Regions:
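Cytochrome P450
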Residues: 1-222
């Protein structure tokens, strides 16, 4: 989102390569459909362009957000031991740990939009074709909506959280993410590695996709 032509060119090359691989599979799936995401969309009547876009979204959403959310939620629980204690005491669950992290740190911090017509909000007029950025990270720390917006607190109500968007733009992968992270990754990590502890500083990076760059840990082998 910084307008770097080299980054843009690299991204365009990558998406074009994915499109070529998709196009190579389409004829085969037209005669021999299967249960793949690509085939299901074709059978549902989506256009080739829509199918390509959705496949690329699934590839991106299936690696960036889970990576950041798993590493970030693990760091949050190791850093805030009193919150992890709520899970071991069974007063709260792994889904609480994941959803509160997604609110507090917002693995998807921003989503771009294009204004289709002149629009006025308060005393600000947005002209048609203007580019705007919807800030999930800001909305998820709204002091008017959350009791302790800047704290990682499993006991906090998350009814107003927009970590997965809202309305017609609600994330199609939300339930898959909850299952992958809260039912598999986090409980497995803490069960398989008892005594896991942080052993260094953790830096976060990213804007649209935000998460820890590294999470150095120590695990005492018993």
């Amino acid at each position: 989102y910084q307008g770097d032509p080299k980054v843009t060119a690299r991204c365009n090359d990558c998406t074009a390569s994915i499109d070529r691989h998709i196009d190579a599979r389409l004829p085969e799936l037209q005669t021999a459909p299967d249960k793949s995401l690509l085939s299901v969309q074709m059978q549902a009547g989506l256009s080739d362009a829509q199918t390509r876009a959705n496949i690329k979204l699934a590839i991106s959403g299936g690696q960036n957000e889970p990576r950041d959310a798993i590493a970030g939620a693990a760091w949050a629980l190791l850093h805030h031991r009193e919150q992890y204690a709520k899970i071991t005491a069974r007063t709260h669950t792994w889904i609480d740990a994941f959803e509160e992290y997604a609110r507090w740190m917002s693995p998807i911090g921003m989503s771009p939009r294009r204004i289709t017509q002149d629009y006025t909000i308060g005393d600000i007029t947005l002209p048609a074709n203007a580019r705007v950025f919807f800030m999930f990270g800001s909305g998820n720390r709204d002091a008017a909506a959350f009791d302790t917006p800047d704290q990682y607190n499993l006991s906090q109500s998350r009814a107003a959280a927009i970590s997965f968007g809202a309305g017609p733009h609600f994330c199609a992968g939300a339930w898959a993410a909850r299952c992958l992270i809260a039912e598999v990754a986090l409980p497995m990590l803490f069960d398989r590695l008892p005594g896991l502890a942080l052993c260094g500083d953790v830096a976060f990076g990213g804007w649209a996709f935000r998460g820890p760059l590294t999470v150095p840990v120590h695990w005492p082998v018993r």
